[in-house]
Amino acid sequence: MWKQYIKQALYQLKENRLISIVCMVGTALAICMIMVIVLTLQIRIKDCVPEVNRSRSLYVKAMTSRHKEQHNNAASSQMSVTTARECFKTLTIPEAVTITSVNNKMRASLPGGGRMSVDEMETDEAFWQVFCFEFLCGKPYTKADFESGLSKAVVSASVARRLFGTTDVVGRTIQLNKADYTITGVVKDVSKLATASYAQVWIPYTSTDLASFSWRENLMGPMRAVILARSSAD
């Protein structure tokens, strides 16, 4: 009986070749799109480098400020540096808490040399504890660098190769919006699907005036927080 069904199916395919081709191509494309969507969701949800701790991380991307008496007077946005520090950096139960800026476009260049536009993120030193980057050379900027507001930078491999022609650039100087930064490390390129950690250049937010950029009585600003729990059960 199965042989008869197969023969009938083959006969119908031969009789209506155009319709058969359209149906097969449509089915293949539908399956392909479903696979792409599933893979994209998996990449954004599952633990993967550098966001290997997603299963025990809490992402605080925005906040809402509401007036105590005027209930219609409310606003939602990212938080200021002051708000992030007072609300989250004082926590003692988590393994680590990092405060980061949203991505910004910045001009990266060499004195008298090449230049390019890069995606830049400003972070604290705990960022390198929460996220696990693959360093090709060097290391991240330290807590001392951060607290001193030193102009240190970690760059991606593609930026290093584009500007210097090599990834062995630790100790060399790069200009970010015409300000000199010393490169402390080079990391493997990060996928844009790693939305919490993606950038091409990372610098301490204390090396800029980002802390002064706030509004709504210093509650809101350009910062986000990631809280790393000690276990996924926390």
Model-predicted segments: where are they?
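The feature marks short, hydrophobic/small-residue-biased sequence motifs that occur predominantly
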Residues: 91, 100-102, 109-140, 146-147, ...
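Membrane-proximal extracellular/periplasmic loop immediately following the first transmembrane helix
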Residues: 37-107, 220-224
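Short, strongly hydrophobic transmembrane alpha-helices
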Residues: 15-44
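Extracytoplasmic/periplasmic beta-strand context in beta-sandwich domains
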Residues: 56-58, 118, 139, 172
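Generic structural signal for small/hydrophobic residues in well-ordered secondary structure
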Residues: 13-16, 23, 44, 58-62, ...
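Solvent-exposed, non-transmembrane alpha-helical starts
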Residues: 70-81, 114-119, 147-151, 190-202, ...
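Mid-to-C-terminal secondary-structure elements
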Residues: 124-141, 151-234
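A short amphipathic helical element positioned immediately N-terminal to and/or at the very start
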Residues: 2-14, 83-87
